[in-house]
Swiss-Prot record:
Pfam families named among the record's database cross-references: CoA_binding, Ligase_CoA
Keywords carried by this UniProt record: Ligase, Nucleotide-binding, Tricarboxylic acid cycle
Positions contributing to CoA binding: T17, G18, K19, Q20, K43, I96, T97, E98
Any one GO biological process: tricarboxylic acid cycle
Annotated Gene3D superfamilies: NAD(P)-binding Rossmann-like Domain, Succinyl-CoA synthetase domains
Gene Ontology CC terms: succinate-CoA ligase complex (ADP-forming)
Record-given protein name: Succinate--CoA ligase [ADP-forming] subunit alpha
Assembly description: Heterotetramer of two alpha and two beta subunits.
Keyword Methyltransferase belongs to the record: no
Disulfide bridge map: none
EC number: 6.2.1.5
Binding site for substrate: Y160
PANTHER family: SUCCINATE--COA LIGASE [ADP_GDP-FORMING] SUBUNIT ALPHA, MITOCHONDRIAL, SUCCINYL-COA LIGASE SUBUNIT ALPHA
Length: 294
């Protein structure tokens, strides 16, 4: 088992013929992902990377039975692209794009609430991968290894760090989910923690958080009552000054809330094994689980 995606997942790309859409679709195909086509309005009927192009997601789903989509369209058009995918019956929408207006995401969230059977990952995220089976997003496939650690993260590059270390230690990953660095994500830490807790392949969970917002504190509360599996966590931004945005739109300490210290305190109180440096994530997993390494 894994969560969200597996080798049966049929994937579309919205923004298929653009530079990023092309590059990451190529990478996904190379990885073994079942890419079934792409959407670029006005180019329907043509083919690209040996796959059909459609004018709309509805048309693409009808023709290919796609059940997942990765979105590589410019930020101003993402809201419409996401809603179009939801309306077409796609069950998993992965939006990679950064810079979507917060107001647009509020509208998307409200729309998703009316469609509880649809799961959206992102925006501003690296995507999701089940090693050896399916890769939807921008993560480097070669560092992943099929295994037993579920990884969920607000950061892209720190996800790769956690992946690389758990691969080198021989633990591997069940599924890795980048929920994204924006203030309003489609999927929260809690959503993913709940999935990992129920997943038989996942035996330990790595959660990479960062300053800003209260997502980690809420996750800590959830872990305390609902998660029996060992959770290892790292929070980025310990030295970040208040009021300064640190890369991600959501990574800002505002109104005295959202500091790394607050988050670490909440996680430790919930029994989470915390590490204070990204270099310690792999060791943290070994220590928290008692697993022997390579």
């Amino acid at each position: 088992m894994s969560i969200l995606i597996d080798k049966e997942t049929r994937v579309l790309c919205q923004g298929f013929t653009g530079k990023q859409g092309t590059f990451h679709s190529e990478q996904a195909i190379e990885y073994g992902t079942q890419m079934v086509g792409g959407v670029t309005p006005g180019k329907g009927g043509q083919s690209h990377l040996g796959l059909p192009i459609f004018n709309s997601v509805h048309e693409a789903v009808e023709e290919t039975s796609a059940d997942a989509t990765m979105i590589f369209v410019p930020a101003p058009f993402c809201k419409d692209s996401i809603i179009e995918a939801v309306d077409a019956g796609v069950r998993l929408v992965v939006c990679i794009t950064e810079g979507i207006p917060v107001l647009d995401m509020l509208e998307v969230k409200a729309y998703l609430r009316q469609h509880p059977d649809v799961r959206m990952i992102g925006p501003n995220c690296p995507g999701v991968i089940t090693p050896g089976e399916c890769k939807i997003g921008i993560m480097p496939g070669h560092i992943h290894q099929r295994g037993k650690v579920g990884i969920v993260s607000r950061s892209g590059t720190l996800t790769y760090e956690a992946v690389n270390q758990t691969t080198q230690m021989g633990f591997g990953q069940s599924t890795c989910v980048g929920i994204g660095g924006d203030p309003i994500p489609g999927t929260s830490f809690i959503d993913v923690l709940e999935m990992f807790e129920k997943d038989s392949q996942t035996q330990a969970i790595v959660m990479v958080g960062e300053i800003g917002g209260t997502a980690e504190e809420e996750a800590a509360e959830f872990i305390q009552s609902n998660v029996k599996k060992p959770v290892i966590s790292y929070i980025a931004g310990v030295t970040a000054p208040p009021g300064k945005r640190m890369g991600h739109a959501g990574a800002i300490i505002a109104g005295g809330k959202g500091t790394a210290a607050d988050k670490y305190a909440a996680l430790e109180a919930a029994g989470v094994f915390v590490v204070k440096s990204p270099a310690e994530i792999g060791k943290g997993v070994a220590e928290a689980t008692g697993w022997s390494t390579h």
